[in-house]
Amino acid sequence: MAKITTASLLNMKQQGKKISTITAYDASFAKLFDQAGIHAILIGDSLGMVLQGQDSTLPVTIEDMAYHTRCVKRGVEETLIIADMPFMSYANEEQALANAALLMQAGASMVKIEGGAWLNGTISALVERGVPVCAHLGLTPQSVNIFGGFKVQGRDDDKAQQMIADAKALEAAGAQLLVLECIPAILGEAITQALTIPTIGIGAGKDTDGQILVMHDALGIACNYMPKFSRNFLKDTGDIKKAVELYISEVSEGNFPGDEHIFK
């Protein structure tokens, strides 16, 4: 597998090939996932919950993210590395530029930020200075207190139409990738069809251009709860690398997510 870039992912969308993405937080797992052929690794601020034992992603700092990005970078040869910008690390453009620089210097090839069209100026500023951006709509975990919990988003028509408009605006601002989380499958399909850039779904149906899972869910090592949109691939294989290879295959062939993983 050749080195994956943002251009590679766009080419996959144009060819109708599915993109497989997973989270990782250290060199050892990153190396296994890279060798398995995963297209992109996200160093997610989900580390606050799955590594640190927090009840949300809000306590995660930019220093945490830079540390884990450096760790992942050491294990990766070909996979695209995306790093989350944590809560309040991009509250204004100046702050966003400084913190994105930390993550890029730590080894990221792209940064991910959560939010709608209000981020247009920030995204443009980052892209103009050479920082590729992955946007994130739907259930954005950094806004959990606004949503009143981890809930499916975009179920009523007004909010669905707003999300489509936001997605188009984020693409126009320069975002090169879009994560869609916990939205009805029909909305995931509509947004994907409306955009030129690839969409990566997590609980967003099977018609997005790719899928992403938190590694702890995909490997069945989540402590207390398996999300509806996830599947334990390790249970089917008994081997971590084979589990990720199965995940990639199931996404590629359109078998994952199945109907049982989809929100209506």
Curated annotation (Swiss-Prot):
InterPro entries: Pantoate_hydroxy_MeTrfase, Pyrv/PenolPyrv_kinase-like_dom, Pyrv_kinase-like_dom_sf. Mg(2+) binds at residues 45, 84, 114. The keyword Cytoplasm applies. One of its GO terms (biological process) is pantothenate biosynthetic process. It catalyses: 3-methyl-2-oxobutanoate + (6R)-5,10-methylene-5,6,7,8-tetrahydrofolate + H2O = 2-dehydropantoate + (6S)-5,6,7,8-tetrahydrofolate. The active site is at residue 181. Catalyzes the reversible reaction in which hydroxymethyl group from 5,10-methylenetetrahydrofolate is transferred onto alpha-ketoisovalerate to form ketopantoate. Belongs to the PanB family. This is 3-methyl-2-oxobutanoate hydroxymethyltransferase. It comes from Colwellia psychrerythraea (strain 34H / ATCC BAA-681) (Vibrio psychroerythus).
